[in-house]
UniProtKB/Swiss-Prot annotation:
It catalyses: N(6)-[(R)-S(8)-aminomethyldihydrolipoyl]-L-lysyl-[protein] + (6S)-5,6,7,8-tetrahydrofolate = N(6)-[(R)-dihydrolipoyl]-L-lysyl-[protein] + (6R)-5,10-methylene-5,6,7,8-tetrahydrofolate + NH4(+). Its EC number is 2.1.2.10. It comes from Burkholderia cenocepacia (strain ATCC BAA-245 / DSM 16553 / LMG 16656 / NCTC 13227 / J2315 / CF5610). It comes from the Bacteria. The glycine cleavage system is composed of four proteins: P, T, L and H. One of its GO terms (biological process) is glycine decarboxylation via glycine cleavage system. One of its GO terms (cellular component) is cytosol. GO terms for molecular function: aminomethyltransferase activity; transaminase activity. This is Aminomethyltransferase.
Length: 372
């Protein structure tokens, strides 16, 4: 059996008596006692997640912008100011999603990308192939010397500033999806991005791995609650945010995964997968579902791979959970394109067909329930 990978915070999680699980080959905390309380901390105050299993990759060279114009489906032409970030899919020639990622622009010769843990090796091999085929001459460097801590919630930024006072000046004016580099902190040189995966405000902090445990402990002392993968999943689902490998993969078009907004077909770029997207168009709708209650009770919980029956044909739930914020069972589903917001569909749970309402995503954003 292959040994699990450990983040630099593994000992810290175990010291907090975290329940650890195998997450894509990484030994990760699913919770530290109460997933519900961790979820609530992020919605109402501040929680933090170890996301050091994700991989930072640095791209340097004179043609780095041209490389990303070809490599990703979103348009790096939108990246004009240092620190600006862009969410995009990385596509194969068939239009399937190799990964979803965030690209940060710092200079015309330096871009930084954060990719998912389970796809990092595949992504880096693909980047290297595109670099070689296109003769871009870039240096592509995975940075496993970095760790990442996501601090999320309405009070997250204030608690980061209390922990790292020297970061306030550089980050207090940051708009969402922007990052700043903060040098010379007690935790080393940091990259602090106003991004996240919870539907709340906050920062994702890229920190030298050798300093991350000290930062983690300092954040805890300033009232930031450690949170595990369990709360991360319920938070991202409420926030309408896709999970790679579950809501989309190499065989699924972003147009069929609710990610059309991340694909820029307006600019005349020859990006990988464009021809396939234009040929196939949108073949399915990607929607939210809320399980209907009978006599105030839901007859089950919506889960991935349950069948969705509609008058227009069958679909499938890609992600599902019980929402702590809404006290409802919620899901994402890929369904026939004719299904409309407001429709009622049937979900096969065990041996029953139970009604669910089709809603627009997201369910919750900035602590407010949006889907009714």
């Amino acid at each position: 059996m292959t040994a699990l990978n450990h983040t630099p915070l593994n000992a810290a999680h175990r010291a907090l008596n975290a329940r650890m699980v195998d997450f894509g080959g990484w030994d990760m905390p699913v919770n530290y006692g109460s997933q519900i309380e961790e979820h609530a901390a992020v919605r109402t105050d501040a929680g933090m997640f170890d996301v050091s299993h994700m991989c930072v990759v640095d791209f340097t060279g004179s043609r780095v912008r041209a490389f990303f114009e070809h490599a990703i489906a979103n348009n790096v032409g939108k990246l004009k100011t240092p620190g600006k970030a862009l969410y995009s899919c990385l596509l194969n020639p068939q239009g399937g999603v190799i990964d979803d990622l965030i690209v940060y622009y710092f200079t015309e010769e330096f871009f930084r990308v954060v990719v998912n843990a389970g796809t990092a090796d595949k992504d880096i091999a693909w980047f290297n192939q595109l670099n070689e085929q296109g003769g871009y001459g870039l240096t592509i460097a995975p940075r496993r010397d970095f760790a990442i801590v996501a601090v999320q919630g309405p009070n997250a930024r204030e608690k980061v500033w209390a922990t790292v006072p020297s970061a306030r000046a550089a980050t207090s004016e940051l708009k969402p999806f922007n990052a700043a580099q903060v040098a010379g902190t007690p935790f080393g040189d940091l990259t602090i991005a106003r991004t996240g995966y919870t539907g709340e405000d906050g920062f994702e902090v890229i920190v030298p791995a050798v300093h991350v445990e000290v930062l983690w402990n300092a954040l805890q002392q300033h009232g930031v609650r450690p949170c595990g993968l369990g709360a991360r999943d319920t938070l991202r689902l409420e926030a309408g945010m896709n999970l790679y490998g579950q809501d989309m993969d190499d065989t699924v078009s972003p147009l069929d995964a609710g990610l059309a907004w991340t694909v820029d077909l307006a600019a005349p770029r020859d990006f990988v997968g464009r021809a396939a997207l234009e040929a196939n168009g949108t073949r399915a709708a990607f929607v939210g579902l809320i399980l209907q209650k009978e006599n105030g009770k839901a007859g089950g919980v919506l889960r991935a791979h349950q069948k969705v029956v509609t008058p227009h044909g069958e679909g499938e739930i890609t992600s599902g959970t019980f929402s702590p914020s809404m006290q409802e069972s919620i899901a994402f589903a890929r369904v026939p394109a004719a299904v409309q917001i407001g429709d009622t569909v049937q979900v096969q749970i065990r041996d029953k067909n139970l009604p669910a309402r089709v809603v627009k995503l997201p369910f919750v954003r900035n602590g407010k329930v949006l889907a009714a």
